[in-house]
Amino acid sequence: MGYEEQLDRALEETPDIEGTAARFSVPDPDVRQEGNATVYENFQPTIDRLDREESHVMKFLQNELGTSANIDERGRLRLTGEFRQARVEEAINDYVEGYVICPECGLPDTRLEKENGAEVLRCEACGARSPAGN
């Protein structure tokens, strides 16, 4: 068997590598109204999936939604005001784009670091360093 035949055989037997969408997904926000507050029921599973500090994500959501928030004793995020599920999901997706997904390789294997007072996204997959939140 020649080189070309071996190469063709190897490529046929190699499984396809799944893209980032299949490998990384964030749970859809489970939100409900409770009085004048919106309760993000599955905030903790979302934080676990994002692998970020809950205070960082909460602060981002506060800024993005223009409201105040706190985390209750059950780990749920309580947002002051009424927000639809689609709006909270949009804000979470914006967070993922700016603070989780590497802008160079598109993988979620990143860490937030402080560098000279600025937040930097460091990718553990490709080694890229880029400003966070862009």
Curated annotation (Swiss-Prot):
It holds the Pfam family eIF-5_eIF-2B. Belongs to the eIF-2-beta/eIF-5 family. Residues 1-12 have a biased composition (Basic and acidic residues). The keyword rRNA-binding does not apply. eIF-2 functions in the early steps of protein synthesis by forming a ternary complex with GTP and initiator tRNA. Transmembrane segments: none annotated. InterPro entries: IF2/IF5, TIF2_bsu_arc, Transl_init_fac_IF2/IF5_dom, Transl_init_fac_IF2/IF5_N, Transl_init_fac_IF2/IF5_Zn-bd. Residues 1-32 are annotated as: Disordered. This is Translation initiation factor 2 subunit beta. The gene is eif2b. Keywords: Initiation factor, Protein biosynthesis. Heterotrimer composed of an alpha, a beta and a gamma chain. Signal peptide: none annotated. One of its GO terms (molecular function) is translation initiation factor activity. It comes from Natronomonas pharaonis (strain ATCC 35678 / DSM 2160 / CIP 103997 / JCM 8858 / NBRC 14720 / NCIMB 2260 / Gabara).
